[in-house]
Regions:
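Conserved catalytic motifs of ABC-family nucleotide-binding domains
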Residues: 155
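Catalytic Walker B motif of ABC-type/P-loop ATPase nucleotide-binding domains
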Residues: 159-163
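ABC ATPase "signature
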Residues: 217-218
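Hydrophobic anchor residue at the start of the ABC signature
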Residues: 148
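Conserved ABC ATPase "signature" region
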Residues: 101, 105, 112-130
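Conserved ABC ATPase signature
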Residues: 93, 134-141
């Protein structure tokens, strides 16, 4: 694995009044790896991710993303990353082509670049016949695949995926992970949050958050060996019980 750090987090904390959602977490992510940010719903995963991508300010601690300080260089962080939110981020009342054009413009692509990438994107997804249809008419699985592809339009160094397979069927989940693998093989770093513990098996390394803290961080193989279990779900259950 490439040991060049592309994300470096030190004692990152987020408080909402008296409630601490993220409790002084520290970890590194290496260039080109698929890093799983796991935990149950409400564990603090999305809150932590929002701090890393510059849309939420940390209460304390430090983080470098793609070499840029998330506190002082937020705009450069945003230019260096792709982001797919937990909720579908395309516009249902725009066509597929209009959505691609809109987000391509946000990412600063030229008209020619947008045109070229539109042709390639719809071909890769097999959506040539739906390019002029409203995105709202697409099934959820296709919407998720489209969101992922659009997040990569500007060829970011890192793509952040927040619960990307939530609500989709097992076949679509597997297809989505095939897309993730293909992008990682190009050298893109993938930072993915999920509460599906079986998806941890697809990651190079995973961290597991429990009640705002990172309770474990290693490869899936090493974590299963450490806790003497056969699945990542069993690892999570042991960690959760230890916290209780």
């Amino acid at each position: 694995m490439n040991k060049e750090k592309i994300i470096a987090v030190q004692n990152l904390t987020k408080q909402f009044c008296s409630f601490t959602a993220v409790k002084s977490i520290s970890f590194d992510v290496y260039k080109g790896e698929i890093f799983g940010f796991l935990g149950a719903n409400g564990a603090g995963k999305t809150t932590a991710m929002k701090m890393l991508i510059g849309i939420s300010k940390a209460t304390s601690g430090d983080a470098l993303v793609a070499g840029f300080d998330v506190k002082t260089n937020t705009e450069m962080v945003k230019r260096s990353i792709g982001y797919m939110s937990q909720k579908f981020s395309m516009y249902d009342d725009l066509t597929l082509k209009e959505n691609i054009t809109f987000f391509g413009g946000i990412y600063g692509l030229s008209r020619n670049q947008i045109k070229e990438k539109t042709v390639r994107l719809v071909a890769e997804l097999g959506l040539e016949d739906t390019i002029d249809k409203l995105v709202g008419s697409l099934p959820l699985g296709w919407k998720q695949k489209l969101s992922f592809s659009v997040a990569l339009l500007h060829e970011p160094k890192i793509v952040f995926l927040d619960e990307p397979t939530g609500g989709v069927d097992p076949i679509t989940r597997r297809q989505f992970w095939e897309m993730i693998y293909a992008e990682a093989n190009k050298g893109t770093t993938i930072f993915v949050t999920t509460h599906y513990m079986d998806e941890a098996e697809y990651c190079d390394r995973v961290s597991i958050m429990v009640e705002g803290s990172i309770e474990a961080l290693d490869t899936p193989k090493n974590l299963k060996a450490k806790y003497n279990v056969n699945s990542m779900n069993e690892v999570f259950l042991k960690l959760a019980r230890n916290v209780e």
